[in-house]
Amino acid sequence: MNFRYNHTPFGYKRRQTREVKVGDVKIGGNNPIVIQSMINSDTTDTKGTVKQILELERTGCEIVRFTVPSQVDADNLPSIRQELKKAGSKIPLVADIHFTPSVAMKAVEYVEKVRINPGNFADKKKFAVRDYTDSEYDEELERISATFSPLVLRCKELGVSMRIGTNHGSLSDRIMNRYGDTPQGMVESALEFIRIAESLNYYDIVVSMKASNPQVMVQAYRMLASRFNELKMDYPLHLGVTEAGDGKDGRIKSAIGIGSLLEDGLGDTIRVSLTEDPVLEIPVARLLAEKFNKRIVKPEPVRGYSEFRNPFTYERFYSSEIKVGTFEAGENHPVRVETVLPFENSNSFLANIAKLYQYGKSFSIEPESILIDSPSPDQLKEISEAAAALSIPVGILLGKNVSLNEKLQNELRGFPKVVFDPFLQFQDGKKMLSFLQERQNAGLYTEIHTSGAKIESFKGLPETLSEIGIKNVLFSIESKEILYDYRKLGSILSQHEFPILLHGSFSNPEEALYDSAIGIGGLLIDGIGDLIRIKTPKMKDIEEIFQLSYDLLQGTRLRLTKTEYISCPSCGRTLFNLQETTARIKSRTGHLKGVKIAVMGCIVNGPGEMADADFGYVGAGPGKVHLYRGKEIVMKNVPSEVADEKLVELIKKHGLWQDVTNV
């Protein structure tokens, strides 16, 4: 299989695409990454719709999308256009179409772009199981072409562009039966429609591969880019994590998916889907886009590293086990969290540890490993005595100016872990190997940590360690280019079993949230990393950073330490107040560790995304809700005033409820 999906996994270069115009806005080519959003008003409400569009435009949104679910909605588009013209607005509009080709033919007259979902434009979702022969499959494609071609021809005639937007939650039965609920199915779903458009000489196309799970979403976009390379297609990509949710969790998921793909050079326009007021999506999208719009491409090529991943599927990078006391990492153990603390004196140190335990009780998390940041050598005795009162390992990060002399090496034997930079702490390689061997013989382990600029010097070291039988070693990197430098490290270690600790140093919690989600999160979804460690300079941030570490593991679906919510951002199809409903359900169920609950405004993606959730709460009509167990409806048309309680009863029935006092 050809694993190539971008220029290189080890450095930044944006994928070259054709330019697609959406009104006066240009997507792809050499243009900056475009920011867009979607309003959540009813499209028949002219005043409310225009108000939201203008608010988004003022906030910096460059393209606005709205749903057009029916002929009545399409009939109101001229009124919306007229009011926007009066207000002096020139922002391009996108009509979002599901299920209704006839409505698309009306909407295309009044917008700059049409979005169609290949999973439901010409198909109805029945979850039917059927084996298609090749001839039967071809007949289905002919049927789709007959339905889709009129819209393509009208778009071509009017100069209207199109997004072919696949959603993981709404693949057609035809695709599901042939390819399964997979990234490959998502890609092939889009390609079927692209081929039809190309047969009519229409190329003003943008493509998206959205999913609520960032891992699935990233794999699908990579596979799409790889297939584009094979087929010599150069369409721009619209990036987004659908149903990302709200608050920090929604921002983390979005940054993991969107940010890591932008790092790979994939993506020309982005939408951050939050279950919040649409204007709150724009600052997040701008932050992500500006990181790359301002990025300078380094002229030198990256050589000497080879692809060691399958970028289209998740497979954990295998490492040997590290075990000290009750602490276990690597091998098949969950990805662990290490917390960095300063040390002033024993009392303040132990108080900080107690604070972390107390904080963690509310979220079912607790400290797993502690690292003391650059203590002076004369503090080691006091640190050792304080650490003896704890059941978790306490390690020492040696400062840059500390020399690892024989006296210090002896003092460090009291610590299960020492972190050092071989290029700062040792001038003699033989002495370093002797130090590592002595610690291994004593049942201790060591972390070799250096800057990304020196990573080339790691080449050959894993072979040397393996030859002399040193195993109790893990590796980490200090870098602003976390994704690329850790991939380089992974390439160097690919034939060995040394664990990898993912380390990130950031100036403040906001930078930590976004940059760790992009860098560390982007590595975790590829199976790279046995421990994570996030560091900021201020002591007051420790609880927030402690929580962020676990939130990253939650966002990548590697460790669920709280309830996982899959909630859509709301649109004109939504059949209840999604923000209020999501907040209400969170207040009832937020303590259910590891339970996945989907809150969906309507049926467009609802049933499909239920497959990724334990329970679902989906709008079925005004004042009515369907409740799901997995992807199966178990309670239909539940009155909304009792739906929350019925959801709790459903969770209890299936044995996944916990009383708050027991958590």
From Swiss-Prot:
It is an enzyme of class 1 (oxidoreductase). GO terms for molecular function: 4 iron, 4 sulfur cluster binding; 4-hydroxy-3-methylbut-2-en-1-yl diphosphate synthase activity (ferredoxin); 4-hydroxy-3-methylbut-2-enyl-diphosphate synthase activity (flavodoxin); iron ion binding. The keyword Membrane does not apply. [4Fe-4S] cluster binds at residues 568, 571, 602, 609. It catalyses: (2E)-4-hydroxy-3-methylbut-2-enyl diphosphate + oxidized [flavodoxin] + H2O + 2 H(+) = 2-C-methyl-D-erythritol 2,4-cyclic diphosphate + reduced [flavodoxin]. Pathway: Isoprenoid biosynthesis; isopentenyl diphosphate biosynthesis via DXP pathway; isopentenyl diphosphate from 1-deoxy-D-xylulose 5-phosphate: step 5/6. It comes from the Bacteria. Binds 1 [4Fe-4S] cluster. InterPro entries: Dihydropteroate_synth-like_sf, IspG_atypical, IspG_bac-typ, NO2/SO3_Rdtase_4Fe4S_sf. Its EC number is 1.17.7.3. GO terms for biological process: isopentenyl diphosphate biosynthetic process, methylerythritol 4-phosphate pathway; terpenoid biosynthetic process. Keywords: 4Fe-4S, Iron, Iron-sulfur, Isoprene biosynthesis, Metal-binding, Oxidoreductase. Gene3D superfamilies: Dihydropteroate synthase-like, Sulfite Reductase Hemoprotein, domain 1. Its cofactor is [4Fe-4S] cluster. Pfam families: GcpE (PF04551). PANTHER family: 4-HYDROXY-3-METHYLBUT-2-EN-1-YL DIPHOSPHATE SYNTHASE, 4-HYDROXY-3-METHYLBUT-2-EN-1-YL DIPHOSPHATE SYNTHASE (FERREDOXIN), CHLOROPLASTIC. Belongs to the IspG family. Converts 2C-methyl-D-erythritol 2,4-cyclodiphosphate (ME-2,4cPP) into 1-hydroxy-2-methyl-2-(E)-butenyl 4-diphosphate. This is 4-hydroxy-3-methylbut-2-en-1-yl diphosphate synthase (flavodoxin). It comes from Leptospira borgpetersenii serovar Hardjo-bovis (strain JB197). The lineage of its organism: Bacteria, Pseudomonadati, Spirochaetota, Spirochaetia, Leptospirales. The gene is ispG.
